[in-house]
């Protein structure tokens, strides 16, 4: 009340009213700025001003029972005055010091677990090495980077469910933990955080850091993996850079790196198979990276790379709307075009059919080592502004832009024929033909492009056909800039479609990606990549193909054996035998196949010549299209270890060695597994024992369906008849007995009956 009276009193004085009503707006704005709202306008000043007071801090009343009134030096720690407007006490900064030194201790066991990301960061910095500082112009471009090392790749929603389940397990609310990673993390964290005294909110914040990828759009020159981004402020300024080697790696960077390598290998391999899309999906579904299924990683990981995006498109996931050409990511920033087929003549008078983009368009081009802005219209480059790390990188960007422009002088610069093919030996499309041609040698292209005088523009410089910089002249429309071009910042994802040749299109039908765009760069993955698909056996070389092929036969011997006798053609066409063909000398593949198939047919016809080891050994050779010839072979050659090695048709060799006593098969000295049945047991024990409870009726009868293996017999109902495959690859018809009492006699009669049925 007193205060209000005082204010009324002030307002009654004419001078006060005059000041408040007539003060100019700029002063008024300042007054407003510092007096309106709860937001502190000058925090540092406020802090200094507050800390100059004796008791700037308020604390809960209970503190007076836990802290002495004075410290050892006799300084007062808290005031007897209570804080105006709350029931807290006023405390001196010295009280905080006293508390830190003498306050109660608590268990620290949970700290490294909760603040895991911080502790790990300290370790990385401790073991990292900082090199010299270099002063030079930094070409930085903004890229979307991962700023949070050491995280899992859960979506925000998935992480939220995990955090709620770990931190507030008893709260109400629907939480569905479905993915493998969610369940594993939840279990792990619940165990780690038993009896944890750290505030739940803090735990939730820290868990979020650990579970979710956080990205920012930051100016970067150099490494973009998260262990470099966390020290960005230490390694690059506007005009300097400091060399740095991280003191440790984090799984999220390793996952990104290994995912790219796996995707590239898979796309390259799928492109050369008969049905690329089906093969790609089969491989993605059967591959694991660091023990996690590749398809799960693809669903969660936002890495944008050509091969990764092709795999995502195949799985029906959304991808970025930018497109790829010549290893650069193009994003249209303005303009539009329509496409029209046009026939053009190269300098060698070869006709090319190209899809011409008609209309004015502007693009940003972002590559690994160079970036550019491109303005073009129908078959004409208007302007190209490039920046890059070095001459080579700048030249690469210029070539791609010139080809993309579809200018006539570029097409006329072609010397010789264009006949580039992809890995599957199919001709590349015309635009990629042109690109490959000029990537090999761009001399004529640059020479024929034409040059022009240039104006002196800050930060821009000309470039001559031999790639030397110049301030007077430049190739027509081309300039080199000191500034980089930012990557496209939006993280929007669009629905795309993919055809069986792995060409990815947006909904308007524009091609965004194709296997030609997948980099040929080879790298060594940081995490173990396990390809279970037979298509990837060859990635580790011929020996791996050999071992894997035989391992596959042994693992699937039960079904292989049935197919061998019933439906050999289907067996020979199995894709698992495809990789093996590359080991067999091309000239003789057909003869080998014909020879082995004839041998197998004799085995089927002549009783008692079924030889498991020999069938396993020779089967892969029968997969090639056979040539009929009278040739006989005592050994077959395979190309491994850089030379031809022999597999003996009868008997063991260093390549294929079967040990009868241990039943183990070794291929090139490597263990390839154990055969579950002994090839040389004849009919004596196994069949008669297994055929107890069955009556052998006679020869195979096709009306009762395909032959079952002995293991499958147990599924028959009493009285049911079936064909069954017995040891030597012979098929007989049996019936399951209706009564169990007569089972004992079966063993004795089985052997006789089998012989009779077969003969």
Curated annotation (Swiss-Prot):
Site (Mammalian adaptation): 627
Family of the protein in this entry: Belongs to the influenza viruses PB2 family.
SUPFAM superfamilies xref list: PB2 C-terminal domain-like
Keywords: Cap snatching, Eukaryotic host gene expression shutoff by virus, Eukaryotic host transcription shutoff by virus, Host gene expression shutoff by virus, Host mitochondrion, Host nucleus, Host-virus interaction, Inhibition of host innate immune response by virus, Inhibition of host MAVS by virus, Inhibition of host RLR pathway by virus, Inhibition of host RNA polymerase II by virus, mRNA capping, mRNA processing, Viral immunoevasion, Viral transcription, Virion
Subunit structure, as described in the record: Influenza RNA polymerase is composed of three subunits: PB1, PB2 and PA. Interacts (via N-terminus) with PB1 (via C-terminus). Interacts with nucleoprotein NP (via N-terminus). Interacts (via N-terminus) with host MAVS (via N-terminus); this interaction inhibits host innate immune response.
Placement of sequence motif Nuclear localization signal: 736-739
Gene Ontology biological process terms from the UniProt entry: 7-methylguanosine mRNA capping; cap snatching; DNA-templated transcription; symbiont-mediated suppression of host cytoplasmic pattern recognition receptor signaling pathway via inhibition of MAVS activity; symbiont-mediated suppression of host gene expression; symbiont-mediated suppression of host mRNA transcription via inhibition of RNA polymerase II activity; viral RNA genome replication
Annotated GO MF terms: RNA binding; RNA-directed RNA polymerase activity
Entry protein name: Polymerase basic protein 2
GO cellular component terms attached to this protein's record: host cell mitochondrion; host cell nucleus; virion component
Localization in the cell: Virion; Host nucleus; Host mitochondrion
Function: Plays an essential role in transcription initiation and cap-stealing mechanism, in which cellular capped pre-mRNAs are used to generate primers for viral transcription. Recognizes and binds the 7-methylguanosine-containing cap of the target pre-RNA which is subsequently cleaved after 10-13 nucleotides by the viral protein PA. Plays a role in the initiation of the viral genome replication and modulates the activity of the ribonucleoprotein (RNP) complex.
């Amino acid at each position: 009340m007193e205060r209000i009276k005082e204010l009324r009193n002030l307002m009654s004085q004419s001078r006060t009213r005059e000041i408040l009503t007539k003060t100019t707006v700029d002063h008024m704005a300042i007054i407003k700025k510092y007096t309106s709202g709860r937001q502190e306008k000058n925090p540092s000043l406020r802090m200094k001003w507050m800390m100059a007071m004796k008791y700037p801090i308020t604390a809960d009343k209970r503190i007076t029972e836990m802290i002495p009134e004075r410290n050892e030096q006799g300084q007062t720690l808290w005031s007897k005055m209570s804080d105006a407007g709350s029931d807290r006490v006023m405390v001196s900064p010295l009280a905080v010091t006293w508390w830190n030194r003498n306050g109660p201790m608590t268990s620290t066991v949970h700290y490294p677990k909760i603040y895991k990301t911080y502790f790990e960061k300290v370790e990385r910095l401790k073991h990292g090495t900082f090199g010299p500082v270099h002063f030079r112009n930094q070409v930085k471009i903004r890229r979307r980077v991962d700023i949070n090392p050491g995280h899992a790749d859960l979506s925000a929603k998935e992480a939220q469910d995990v955090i709620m389940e770990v931190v507030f397990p008893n709260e109400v609310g629907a939480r569905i933990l479905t993915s493998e990673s969610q369940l594993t993390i939840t279990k792990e964290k619940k165990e780690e955080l038993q009896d944890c005294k750290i505030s739940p909110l803090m735990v939730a914040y820290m868990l979020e850091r650990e579970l979710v990828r956080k990205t920012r759009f930051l100016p970067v020159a150099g490494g973009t993996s998260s262990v470099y981004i966390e020290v960005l402020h230490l390694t690059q300024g506007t005009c300097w850079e400091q060399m740095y080697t991280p003191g440790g790696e984090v799984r999220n960077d390793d996952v990104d790196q290994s995912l790219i390598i796996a995707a590239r290998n898979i796309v390259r391999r799928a492109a050369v198979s008969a049905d690329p899309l089906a093969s790609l999906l089969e491989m993605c579904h059967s591959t694991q990276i660091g023990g996690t299924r590749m398809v799960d990683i693809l669903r969660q990981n936002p890495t944008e790379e050509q091969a990764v995006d092709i795999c995502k498109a195949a799985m029906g996931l959304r991808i970025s709307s930018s497109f790829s050409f010549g290893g650069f990511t193009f994003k249209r920033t303005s303009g539009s075009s329509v496409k029209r087929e046009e026939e053009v003549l190269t300098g060698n008078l070869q006709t090319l059919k190209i899809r011409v983009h008609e209309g004015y368009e502007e693009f940003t081009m972002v590559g690994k080592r160079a970036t550019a802005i491109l303005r073009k219209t129908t078959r004409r480059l208007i302007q190209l502004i490039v920046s890059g790390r070095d001459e080579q990188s700048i030249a690469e960007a210029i070539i791609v832009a010139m080809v993309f422009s579809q200018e006539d002088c570029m097409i006329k610069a072609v010397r010789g024929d264009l006949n580039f093919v992809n890995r599957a030996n199919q001709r590349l499309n015309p635009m990629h033909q042109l690109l490959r041609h000029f990537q090999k040698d761009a001399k004529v292209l640059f020479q024929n492009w034409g040059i022009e005088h240039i104006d002196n523009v800050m930060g821009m410089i000309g470039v001559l056909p031999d790639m030397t910089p110049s301030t007077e002249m430049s190739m027509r429309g081309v300039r080199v800039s000191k500034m980089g071009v930012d990557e496209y910042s939006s993280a929007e994802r669009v629905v795309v479609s993919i055809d069986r040749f792995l060409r990815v299109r947006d909904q308007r039908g524009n091609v965004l990606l194709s296997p030609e765009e997948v980099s040929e760069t080879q790298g060594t993955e940081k995490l173990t990549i396990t390809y279970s698909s037979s298509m990837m056996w060859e990635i580790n070389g011929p020996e791996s193909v050999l071992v894997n092929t035989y391992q596959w036969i042994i693992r699937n011997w039960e079904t292989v054996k049935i197919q061998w006798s019933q439906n050999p053609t289907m067996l020979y066409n199995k894709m698992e035998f495809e990789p093996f063909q590359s080991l067999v000398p091309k000239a003789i593949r057909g003869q080998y196949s014909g020879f082995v198939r004839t041998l197998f047919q004799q085995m089927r016809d002549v009783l008692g010549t079924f030889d498991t080891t020999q069938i396993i050994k020779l089967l892969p050779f029968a997969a090639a299209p056979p040539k009929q010839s009278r040739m006989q072979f005592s050994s077959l050659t395979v190309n491994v270890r850089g030379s031809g090695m022999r597999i003996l048709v009868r008997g063991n060799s260093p390549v294929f060695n079967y040990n009868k006593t241990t039943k183990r098969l070794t291929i090139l000295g490597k263990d390839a597994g154990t055969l579950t049945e002994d090839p040389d047991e004849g009919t004596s024990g196994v069949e008669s024992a297994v055929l107890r409870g069955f009556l052998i009726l006679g020869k195979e009868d096709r009306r009762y369906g395909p032959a079952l293996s002995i293991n499958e017999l147990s599924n028959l109902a009493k009285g049911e008849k079936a064909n069954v495959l017995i040891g030597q690859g012979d098929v007989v018809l049996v019936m399951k007995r209706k009564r169990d009492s007569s089972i004992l006699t079966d063993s004795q009669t089985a052997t006789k009956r089998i012989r009779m049925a077969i003969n």
